[in-house]
């Protein structure tokens, strides 16, 4: 991989996490799950862009924003979504870099490391928001795509190079070409074609075929190229992003989640086999089990969407449990311990008021019409 400038998290962000862990209490919202979620989404708009949460992440995170851009658009916030993209592109172009995070003052950083999915997330959200790129923005993205290919892609095959140590959605775990990353690159390839971006020359179909031929194990998409374990984002994102459109495989995955009780007590745990993964040092020490079998509401909201999209018999029960969790904590929390209590560790506690609440608010649109 070519050497790129490192954009480390500023010390102020680390202090913010420490302060939030020991000295700040969660804000609480009144009302039912829908009212709480709607209030959170409203407050995550800071007048300039959508921040990621009302707690630890009061800044811009492209990965999270990309996953809620469609939901925010469905909720009627299309102008704010596009304003967020404009602002983010301005900050990126000013520094000639694309990072996972941007502070409200426009400072770029990656947390915990540079992300394999950073550029795919940016390009995906541009496409899903129907954002009109100007020539300056297009030229910038063409350069970043060239760098991405140099850093991550085997030019002969178009596939991800093996064993990158860079981060991705489940950033406490270390992957070797995760199914999630392959799905995000498939979406980037699709979006590039439709946005008229020429510097990523590979067809989205080769990544779809890779998922089907190498990652699908009969029950779900394997976590990565060599690890056959279940990981929520790797199992769900290929269907959520429509990298794979196969209802039989989707229902096989939903069967597995049901049978293995992965969505209990709330949707849903990262994995049912946490010992089958390698974790970064901080995820084994000061933030133990952060990316193990903890419950992540991000994937939980996606899970509900997929359940209702297939009109599954367990959909209503899971939605009721999820709503009770939101009402129990009077917020949309980031993650919970396996027993359903709020996650706390030596350095870190679960954030509050996650922008992911936007996904939850659009679940009704996936329910069968009566």
Model-predicted regions and their roles:
Residues 29-36, 76-91, 133-151, 194-217, ...:
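Extended, well-ordered alpha-helical scaffold segments
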Residues 16-36, 75, 93, 126-180, ...:
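Active-site acid/base region of carbohydrate-active enzymes
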Residues 293-333:
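C-terminal hydrophobic structural anchor segments
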Residues 57, 95-101, 156-167, 174-275, ...:
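Catalytic cores of carbohydrate-active enzymes
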Residues 2-16, 47-66, 73, 103-120, ...:
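Solvent-exposed loop and edge beta-strand segments that line ligand/cofactor-binding
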Residues 6, 10-26, 66-78, 120-136, ...:
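Well-ordered alpha-helical scaffold segments within catalytic/enzyme domains
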Residues 1-60, 82-83, 87, 96:
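Low-complexity, Ser/Thr/Pro/Gly-enriched N-terminal "stalk/linker" regions
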Residues 58-156, 182, 294-304, 320, ...:
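Aromatic-rich carbohydrate-recognition surfaces in CAZymes
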